């Protein structure tokens, strides 16, 4: 495999082959800080704020956003992780994956939840997350933050906070990692 190529887990399978880097690590850092400021401004601080990262891509972004919010506000907001595999509407069409840990440290009742993912594509993962969150209390508000919004929505879902809008073709893939954001294709193993 080339330096950036990596094997992908189901449902995609195959190998991600990068075509171009669209955000370097500094771009991702700046986007994270901007989103942190936007979250604080929109919510008038950190009171009642909870950050929930979607397994697996949203989890590292959640940690970085929490650190940025702490640096700006001096408050470390509660964070958690959410696995939506069994809430998806396409569960029968995809291979069943091992369940990733859902860890939500607080009752979400009357809280403002910022749901965080790496890439927003069709909106189906977010729809599943909204269903899953209801098991943890009735949030006052749920907001959505994504590092990349690539369009191609199949459901009426729109993010509140976006690191970068990145128009893509449907067959392209986007990979968000520590080295930045890459656009590429999926090839058989």
Where are these regions (language model features)?
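PRPP-associated nucleotide enzymes
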Residues: 1-189
């Amino acid at each position: 495999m080339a330096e950036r190529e990596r094997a992908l887990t189901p449902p995609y399978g195959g190998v991600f082959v990068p075509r171009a880097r669209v955000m370097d690590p500094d771009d991702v850092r700046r986007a994270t800080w901007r989103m942190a400021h936007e979250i604080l401004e929109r919510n008038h601080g950190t009171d009642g704020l909870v950050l929930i990262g979607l397994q697996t891509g949203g989890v590292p972004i959640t940690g970085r956003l929490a650190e940025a919010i702490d640096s700006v506000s001096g408050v470390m907001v509660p964070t958690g992780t959410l696995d939506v595999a069994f809430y998806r509407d396409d569960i029968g069409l995809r291979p069943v994956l091992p369940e990733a840990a859902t860890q939500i440290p607080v009752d979400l009742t009357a809280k403002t939840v910022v749901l965080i993912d790496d890439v927003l594509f069709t909106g189906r993962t977010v729809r599943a997350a909204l269903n899953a969150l209801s098991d943890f209390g009735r949030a006052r508000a749920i907001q959505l933050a994504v590092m990349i919004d690539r369009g191609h929505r199949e459901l009426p879902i729109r993010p509140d906070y976006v690191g970068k809008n990145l128009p893509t073709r449907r067959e392209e893939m986007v990979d968000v990692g520590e080295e930045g954001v890459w656009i590429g294709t999926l090839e058989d193993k």
